[in-house]
């Protein structure tokens, strides 16, 4: 079967080969292609099943249209859901993503970073840099990088990043629960040394204070760093915080932990309101409400910072949204 060439696509779309190359391979910035011609070129490429020669495109000075994304392989639903939105929005912008999965290993991240650049990836989104004990290594890896944007504040000063906040949503959640008679608010979160967990801890206490209530550290349980199993962590939370302190309302960000705690509470016939935070579909099955982290807005902001460097003089802040759970 004869291989489809760029010339074949150009002929079907009734445009020049250079115009077709600009749309499909990146081409020179000196070449301008109108919206109607672009549509004809893309339609022709689909009909002919044209495959871009990536190596040739890069050598010719074109844009690979590839975005690299670093993800921690131990990441919970929140990060995986964000990756889905990054991929979906990238596709609408004419880009594809290549994902690097690793955990707690800067050496692997460095190898992937170098390899993906050899493949022509020109921009990266990093969602795997929140390692408190590896800050020196993270700084060394990205010290000279000007093609990386970060999800949450990195340990490198001045680098572009998108920040998220639950403060407003948590404040509204607690206010709504207070109107329904709840008074003792507890939460559970991961290892406190990680900046993202520090932020959750701080914002939860701030939301308590904003509602005129007393902040009580005894109602906050930190999962042991050495234990990863959600069921074991839930049992420890029951033993160390829930049973001794008896909160009447629990904010649990992740649905797996919420399900584990809910199961233990039901077995012991202890009534307690639980509210989630990462909007995982499992919450619906559990009958538990959840905050909306606004994943699409986060992904859009990350891509905007990456693809438009002129927008990097500000830090986008994406606020989670409280959806009244009722009852």
List PLM regions with ranges:
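Short beta-strand segments enriched in small/hydrophobic residues
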Residues: 17-22, 59-74, 184-191
């Amino acid at each position: 079967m004869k291989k489809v060439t760029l010339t074949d696509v150009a002929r079907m779309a009734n445009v020049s080969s250079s115009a077709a190359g600009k749309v499909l391979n990146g081409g020179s910035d000196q070449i301008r292609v109108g919206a109607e011609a672009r549509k004809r070129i893309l339609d022709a490429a689909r009909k002919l099943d044209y495959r871009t020669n990536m190596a040739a495109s890069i050598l010719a000075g074109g844009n690979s249209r590839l975005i690299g994304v670093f993800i921690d392989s131990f990441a919970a639903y929140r990060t995986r859901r964000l990756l889905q939105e990054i991929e979906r929005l990238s596709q609408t912008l004419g880009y594809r993503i290549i994902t690097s999965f690793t955990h707690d290993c800067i050496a692997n991240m460095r190898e992937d970073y170098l390899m993906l650049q050899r493949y022509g990836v020109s921009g990266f989104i990093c969602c795997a840099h929140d390692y408190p004990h590896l800050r020196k290594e993270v700084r060394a890896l990205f010290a000279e990088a000007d093609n990386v944007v970060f999800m949450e504040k990195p340990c490198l000063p001045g680098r572009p990043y998108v920040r998220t906040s639950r403060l407003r949503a948590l404040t509204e959640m607690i206010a709504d629960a207070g109107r329904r008679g709840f008074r003792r608010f507890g939460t559970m979160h991961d290892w406190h040394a990680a900046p993202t967990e520090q932020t959750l801890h701080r914002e939860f206490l701030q939301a308590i204070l904003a509602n005129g209530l007393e902040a009580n550290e005894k109602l906050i349980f930190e999962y042991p760093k050495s234990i990863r199993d959600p069921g074991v962590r839930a049992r420890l939370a029951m033993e160390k915080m829930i049973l001794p302190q008896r909160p009447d309302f629990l904010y649990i960000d992740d649905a797996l932990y919420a399900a584990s705690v809910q199961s233990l509470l039901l077995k012991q016939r202890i009534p307690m309101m639980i509210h989630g935070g990462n909007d995982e579909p499992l919450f619906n099955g559990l009958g538990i409400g959840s905050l909306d982290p606004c994943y699409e807005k986060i992904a859009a902001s990350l891509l905007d910072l990456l693809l438009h460097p002129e927008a990097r003089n500000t830090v986008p802040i994406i606020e989670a949204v409280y959806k009244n759970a009722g009852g």
